[in-house]
Amino acid sequence: MNTNYWIGVVSEQHVLKGAAGGFAQLCHGKKAPLAKMKEGDWLIYYSPRDAYPDGKLLRSFTAIGKVKSGNIYPYQMAPNFIPYRLDIDYYPCHKIGFYDIKSKLEFVQETKHLGFLFRRGHFEISKKDFLTIAQAMGVNISGMAL
């Protein structure tokens, strides 16, 4: 089974809730982005702001985790808001500014309009980029099944 590596674009405040609860929620609770991920895939969160929608600019990678089972489930947060979630094993890390490692990332060099890529809310990256970001975030990757 091939492992895929993903970026999810979410405010830091929402990332922290997901990390504390052991789940991922993307693109305002849509199911489709979660359905692209499977057990054993990796997710790194990029947070453009500290809070949604008008928080202070952050532009940092803020969390990293591995997809547990790949089972997607609805979760009622409010009477009219039932987003989809996916369980994630999060790893200890520290946030790292995007501009601190931008020049080392392949997806940056290969993308003409970087803003469009981030606005998608979820996209795949190479294993090399994953390792670059993970190491910059202080994640101990030795011995991890990648």
UniProtKB/Swiss-Prot annotation:
Disulfide bonds: none annotated. It comes from the Bacteria. Belongs to the UPF0310 family. HAMAP family: UPF0310 (MF_00771). This is UPF0310 protein YdcG. The gene is ydcG.
